[in-house]
Amino acid sequence: MVGREKELSIHFVPGCCQLVEEEVNIPSRRVLITGATGLLGRAVYKEFQQSNWHTVGCGFRRARPKFEQVNLLDSEAVHHLIHDFQPHVIVHCAAERRPDVVESQPDAASQLNVGASGNLAKEAAAIGAFLIYISSDYVFDGTNPPYTEEDIPSPLNLYGKTKLDGEKAVLENNLGAAVLRIPVLYGEVEKLEESAVTVMFDKVQFSNKSANMDHWQQRFPTHVKDVASVCRQLAEKRMLDPSIKGTFHWSGNEQMTKYEMACAIADAFNLPSSHLRPITDSPVIGAQRPKNAQLDCSKLETLGIGQRTPFRTGIKESLWPFLIDKRWRQTVFH
């Protein structure tokens, strides 16, 4: 369904230009995306926009000109944004997602991951909007996978704790909200450092220098466009069925260590991998990580919700713009 609004546009004709008022179609379903400048947020914004939703994204440092600039710690600004736009759905992607940064800046991380999330849930409840809070597999300690939504969380690091506390703040302030736990993400990055998966590409490409790669932690790399599709499917199902709420899991289904991901990346681009060295010891530097926090996704699958991109396909799409050897890019893609 769409509504109609009037919009001004400039028409150029020989000798003059005219300001013309035209009717344009505006989708009637409204969605607000927080963290829309980030890797996941960009994908979620694109997914809803291309599916005929009236989509507004907000960010902070990189917001302008495409997105609304909003500090989520400013409760008054958040209130005005939500009450002015009146979204049917809010997808809350904004977070401090880097475990080591959370350890070094715990107060700032807690304000964003917990405080801002609870406030957003309260504002969503006030206008009857369906809130999807993006959480993490790091709420589990990784000792007894796979984890269902009913398993009791036990985070190992402060990042996992802030995400779990964020879940509690959301569900306490909004009984109709949904929590979507997801694992490590990758996708169309603006820079390699944007994802813990894509950041390995330089080490893969510089084959003249050996590189140590973690071969201890089991990960399930998941494409952001798959998570975005799940968010949209969840939102559309909720608009038909108010019982869609609570906690859900989504994840890719290919189990890999960072070493195995790096080898798969090398293989996808026909690059050598003999310089990559698997390290099987538990990492001793940085925030503690769960060994295997695999998520059981059967709850969403039973609802008919899901999408999975094979890792080799997704990583090739994501990384080819960062290829150092441009000859390979030309022969494969042109």
Curated annotation (Swiss-Prot):
**GO molecular function term, any single one:** enzyme binding
Q: Does the keyword Nuclease apply?
A: no
Q: Where is this region: Required for interaction with MAT2A?
A: 319-334
Alphabetically sorted, this entry's keywords are: NADP, One-carbon metabolism, Phosphoprotein
Q: Which Pfam families match?
A: RmlD_sub_bind (PF04321)
Provide the binding site for NADP(+).
T37, G38, L39, L40, F60, R61, R62, N71, L72, C93, R97, Y159, L185
| Organism superkingdom | Eukaryota
Pathway, according to UniProt? Amino-acid biosynthesis; S-adenosyl-L-methionine biosynthesis; S-adenosyl-L-methionine from L-methionine: step 1/1
Cellular component GO terms held in the UniProt record: methionine adenosyltransferase complex; mitochondrion; nucleus
Any one Gene Ontology BP term: one-carbon metabolic process
Can you tell me which family this protein belongs to? Answer: Belongs to the dTDP-4-dehydrorhamnose reductase family. MAT2B subfamily.
Instruction: Please describe the quaternary structure of this protein.
Output: Heterotrimer; composed of a catalytic MAT2A homodimer that binds one regulatory MAT2B chain. Heterohexamer; composed of a central, catalytic MAT2A homotetramer flanked on either side by a regulatory MAT2B chain. NADP binding increases the affinity for MAT2A.
What protein name does the entry list? Answer: Methionine adenosyltransferase 2 subunit beta
User: Which gene is the coding source of this polypeptide chain?
Assistant: Mat2b
